[in-house]
Regions:
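Bacterial N-terminal signal peptides that target proteins for export
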Residues: 1-8
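Sec/Tat signal peptide C-region and signal peptidase I cleavage site
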Residues: 17-22
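A contiguous strand-loop segment
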Residues: 23-138, 158-285, 289, 294-295
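Short, charged, surface-exposed loops that flank catalytic or proteolytic processing sites
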Residues: 148-154
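Short, well-structured alpha-helical segments that form the helix of a local strand-helix-strand
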Residues: 155-164, 303-307
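Accessory, solvent-exposed terminal regions and/or long lumenal/extracellular loops of proteins
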Residues: 260-327, 331-336, 425, 430-445
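Substrate-recognition/cap regions that form aromatic- and gly/pro-loop-enriched pockets
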Residues: 316-445
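Histidine-centered catalytic/metal-binding microenvironments
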Residues: 418-498
């Protein structure tokens, strides 16, 4: 059994290539949250050296020409017309291409998070393959949709039209959110897709596998390619007489032994966090509920905790377990190669400037700090727009990544130092944040410009404080590591005089 598990891990690693392949996504309806906000959490996992930059894209007027992925050294040769008048929007993007924005909002208050890499059945891809040469990929989704979509539903519709006409260059899931609705979009094959509106009183979690089951044509809670059911019937992955109600995941998504160790456990773990009374086995992934009502209303803190999870306190803990046979069997949510994770929060009752906020942890969430980035921000402190795949002394990404790399040389010894300091920082920040938002709203009613100035001053101050703390922690861990190395090398020369 152990040999089969290890073989499946090796096989999955080989398949996972170079895109943002191993993400985990959580969506929470407004009536399932503790304050009436809609929440989205996602980790972006690929390569630890993939530095990120924070970008604010200004509004544009009278544009002509084409968006070109290739022109930015993107994934392929996908092109799409630029919007004549494009809205201002934000992204956290790849430092090299400035594409592949993991998360962002536009000036209409509409946001997206993407993508979740998913895999279709091989037999269907032979009939309707991905358009790897010129189809849309995660590199281009944010920069094509955010400047033009005025609602979550419009974003779903537009992406669906692109997939049906130009094709998907890969399999993906994308979150769309606005003041009223929360949608999740999944590709099936190169030109097939569906999307589902998230129930207000439930949450949804997915991990590198198609998870949407129900799809009903002409139902306002669903959208999809016009022949998505017929295609499955024609290609014998769905038989209405035998299978009953159409199940998109069962009809389109790959499901094999790799999912048992790589994908199912993450979904199961999150559901066990939010519904402790639910008893499930990691291996029963196809039986996991798609949507669930949490046993207690969920908060931003709950989603942060989920993004930091690594089977904590069990024999399967990827970093702290003493059981070498079990510690690396199941893929955790928080992994070292995560280059950023985020929690989006939409509070429609507040002005968009503070009502749309994204909490971002750069690098490995378990060893990072979540800071709130409000949509009213007009800029960042030094280092946020800098970076490359080579470590430097300027990029904010490398400020956090250097500390995480040091800690992972001896996780058990060094991680408590970092985690305790960041937990204290976040707790104190929550108090400051509540006070700031109260002051902002009082000012906003009298003078919006002064309120926005306050927002930017507050935000940049906490960016700097977190950066300073991280430098302090890096020096502290480096000092500890130096002392440990000194003791280790002295022991090698025991009885000798250096």
């Amino acid at each position: 059994m152990k040999g089969k598990i290890l073989a499946s891990i090796v096989a999955m690693s080989a398949i996972l290539g170079t895109s943002s392949l191993a993400c985990t996504t959580i969506l929470v309806g407004d009536k399932a949250s503790n304050d009436g906000s809609m929440l989205v959490a996602r980790s972006a996992d690929s390569k630890a050296v993939k530095a990120q930059v924070f970008l604010i894209h200004p509004a544009t007027k009278n544009q002509t020409g084409m968006h070109s992925s290739k022109a930015h050294d993107g994934a392929n040769d996908f092109t799409y017309p630029l919007p004549k008048d494009g809205m201002r929007y934000t992204t956290i993007a790849n430092s090299h291409t400035k594409l592949h924005g993991a998360v962002g909002y536009n000036e209409a208050g509409v946001g997206l998070s993407g993508t979740e890499t998913i895999y279709a059945k091989d037999e269907l891809l032979k009939v309707d393959p991905y358009n790897e040469e010129t189809g849309i990929t995660e590199d281009d989704i944010p920069d094509v949709l955010l400047p033009r979509m005025k609602s979550a539903k419009e974003g779903v519709k537009l992406l669906g039209e692109i997939v049906e006409t130009k094709g998907a260059g890969e399999g993906f899931g994308v979150v769309f959110i606005d003041a009223n609705e929360l949608w999740y979009f999944e590709t099936g094959t190169g030109h097939k897709w569906i999307a589902s509106k998230i129930p207000q009183d439930e949450y949804f979690v997915t991990a590198n596998q198609g998870r949407l089951h129900a799809y009903k044509e002409n139902d306002p809670n669903f959208m999809g390619a016009k022949d998505v059911i017929k295609f499955a019937i024609d290609n014998k992955t769905y038989d209405p007489a035998k299978d009953g109600e159409f199940n998109f995941t069962k009809a389109y998504t790959r499901d094999d032994e790799r999912d048992v160790t790589y994908n199912y456990p993450r979904v199961c773990w999150v559901q066990s966090m939010f519904n402790p009374s639910l008893k499930q086995d990691f291996a029963d992934g196809q039986k996991f509920p798609v949507f669930l009502k949490p046993e207690k209303k969920l908060s931003v803190e709950d989603l942060k905790a989920a993004m930091r999870a690594h089977y904590d306190g069990t024999a399967f803990d990827n970093y702290a377990s003493k059981d070498e046979d079990k510690k690396n069997i199941y893929r955790a949510i928080s992994v070292f190669r995560t280059y950023e994770s985020h929690v989006m929060q939409v509070r429609p009752w507040l002005p968009k400037e503070i009502g749309r906020v994204t909490y971002v942890a750069l690098g490995m969430a378990d060893l990072s700090v979540y800071l709130p980035y409000y949509e009213g921000l007009d800029g960042f402190i030094k280092g946020y727009s800098d970076g490359s795949y080579d470590a430097d002394d300027t990029s904010i990404y490398w400020v956090y990544r250097k500390l995480q790399t040091l800690v992972m040389t001896d996780y058990e010894k060094y991680s408590p130092v970092v985690k305790e300091a960041y937990a204290k920082f976040e707790k104190e920040l929550a108090v400051k944040q509540a006070k700031f938002e109260d002051e902002y709203m009082k000012l906003y009613k009298k003078d919006k410009k002064k309120a926005d100035k306050l927002l930017n001053e507050f935000s940049k101050k906490i960016m700097q404080e977190a950066k300073d703390l991280t430098h302090e922690l890096t020096n502290k861990v480096f000092t500890m590591l130096t002392a440990d190395m000194d003791a280790k090398l002295k022991s090698l020369n025991k009885g000798k005089k250096d």
